[in-house]
Amino acid sequence: MKNAIILHGMPSKEGYYEPNRECPSNEHWLPWLQHQLIIKDILAQTPEMPRPYDPDYQEWLNVFNQFTINEDTILIGHSCGGGFLVRWLSENTIKVGKVILVAPWIDTDKILKSDFFNFKIDNNMSDKAESIVIFGSNNDDQEIKDSIDKLRNEIKNVKYKEFNFGHFVYSDMKTKEFPELLQEAIS
C-alpha cells in the first residue's frame, strides 16, 4: 500500500507556544494535502515533530522511524522538514518513492546551534528515490534560496519547479490548498 509522510518546518518558539496557533503539523497546506492523499487511498501521516522550534535530529529521527518507509512511500518535507529528509536520505540506503522538498532549508548560514544539519549531502541520493523534486519560490527568503541552490548544485538528477508562493505558508499563499503539490505527489 502506498503511504506518505509529510513533515512540517521549524516555527519560532514564540509561535509554537502561541495558544491560538495550530500545531505545525496542522498548519498551512499540510492537513489539506494529507486529506487529499487519503481519499486517493494513500495513507498519509503528518507527524508532530518534537520541539520543532529547536530541532534535534535524533529526536526527529526517533519519530520518523516509527513509520513504514519503502519504495511505496512518498516523502514530503517543508522547510526544515525538507532539510531533515535530505539528511535522512544522505545517511540511509532505503529506497523510497517520490521525494518532494518544499522550500527546503539546510541552514547554509549555520543559524542553528545544534547538529541538525551537520552532515554531508549524498550527491547520488536520487538513486534512492523514484524522483526528487524541489519546489522553490522566487520570492522566498534568501537563506531558503541559498539552500535550494546548494541542493540543486550538489544532488544529481534533482528536478526543480519554481512558484511565486513566498515560503509556501498560508500568509504567503493565502490558501490552505496546494493542488500543484498534490499533482506532483500523485503523478
What is the predicted role of each segment?
Residues 128-129, 133-136:
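Short beta-strand/loop motif that positions the catalytic acidic residue
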Residues 76-86:
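Gly/Ala-rich beta-loop-alpha elbow adjacent to hydrolase catalytic centers
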Residues 55, 165-178:
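Catalytic histidine-centered segment of alpha/beta-hydrolase-like enzymes
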Residues 152-170:
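Catalytic histidine neighborhood in serine/cysteine hydrolases
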Residues 9-10, 48-52, 99-109, 137:
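Active-site nucleophile loop of the alpha/beta-hydrolase fold
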Residues 140-147:
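Conserved alpha/beta-hydrolase "acid-adjacent" motif
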